[in-house]
Curated annotation (Swiss-Prot):
Dimethylallyl diphosphate binds at H49, H85, H135, S234, S235, N236, S279. The gene is ispH. Pathway: Isoprenoid biosynthesis; dimethylallyl diphosphate biosynthesis; dimethylallyl diphosphate from (2E)-4-hydroxy-3-methylbutenyl diphosphate: step 1/1; Isoprenoid biosynthesis; isopentenyl diphosphate biosynthesis via DXP pathway; isopentenyl diphosphate from 1-deoxy-D-xylulose 5-phosphate: step 6/6. Gene3D superfamilies: 3.40.50.11270, 4-hydroxy-3-methylbut-2-enyl diphosphate reductase, catalytic domain. It comes from Rhizobium johnstonii (strain DSM 114642 / LMG 32736 / 3841). The lineage of its organism: Bacteria, Pseudomonadati, Pseudomonadota, Alphaproteobacteria, Hyphomicrobiales. [4Fe-4S] cluster binds at C20, C107, C206. The active site is at E137 (proton donor). Belongs to the IspH family. Binds 1 [4Fe-4S] cluster per subunit. Keywords: 4Fe-4S, Iron, Iron-sulfur, Isoprene biosynthesis, Metal-binding, Oxidoreductase. This is 4-hydroxy-3-methylbut-2-enyl diphosphate reductase. It is an enzyme of class 1 (oxidoreductase).
Amino acid sequence: MNIAAKPPLTIRLCGPRGFCAGVDRAIQIVVLALKSYGAPVYVRHEIVHNRYVVEGLEAKGAVFVEELDEIPAEHRAQPVVFSAHGVPKSVPEDAASRNLFYLDATCPLVSKVHKQAMRHNRLGRHVVLIGHAGHPEVIGTMGQLPEGSVSLIETIEDADAYVPVDPDNLGYVTQTTLSVDDTAGVITRLHERFPNLTAPAADSICYATTNRQEVVKQAAPGCDLFIIVGAPNSSNSKRLVEVALRAGAKKSILVQRAAELDWDEIGAISTLGLSAGASAPEVIVNEIIEAFRARFDARVELAETVQETENFLVNRELRNIELTAADMAFVNG
């Protein structure tokens, strides 16, 4: 019996992809807290926007809540971790009022945006925050400042319609996970309308967001399909889907697990682009590759722009706890 040959497929695997230093740090904080203090360790909001990661931490003993009042009184001696997206100032204040011990896993680059916004405010500027309404990072940044001292701008249309009280006394910051190109367009329009608009001391969009978008731009032309591994509530992952389409991929989709792949819809392809959002673990990237290898004679080509070496330290309370490869195998493989 003749066995049909698998059709050839080139997979353009983007690098860098997947976890950034801030996500790595946040997950490590929860893992180390569990090793140090024992289960349960409470986490306010998803530590990062990825269900695979959340479920892996739940299996280790983490309990995810949306508000601090969900923590049972009998467990208030256990630590609570704040997510990588950052929280309003009111959250640690609430934790202190409840005598909760908390570990802040806010990404240091998000904390930098908080400081930039507070500096604008301290110098008397009204803060313009470029970001997506309702995103936890935006909620956290707006929550650093008094009510009414921040205006949220999402699009160029918002920038056109914006009417500030004092157009000569504005300073902007941005969410860290936005589209680099879209954000540049909004900033340009704001500068056109408000020439005295003050920029932050450093770019707010994080290195990892920029790097992942740049390599997707380079890899996308000529791809029949581009897959971004990530969750539907992951801002940076959704931006990568958009970047791939704009850069020339015929189709781009967001996938959480290989089981979601619709092979009838994928059809006959010869070139596949593959990357992962900053909160998507490498084990799922490998899972996707193996799913395609089962159906295609797949050859993987690495499309790499830069190598990332950034590393953020965990909280001081956890630095003497050993973190092993086995501790992180659930996400790293």
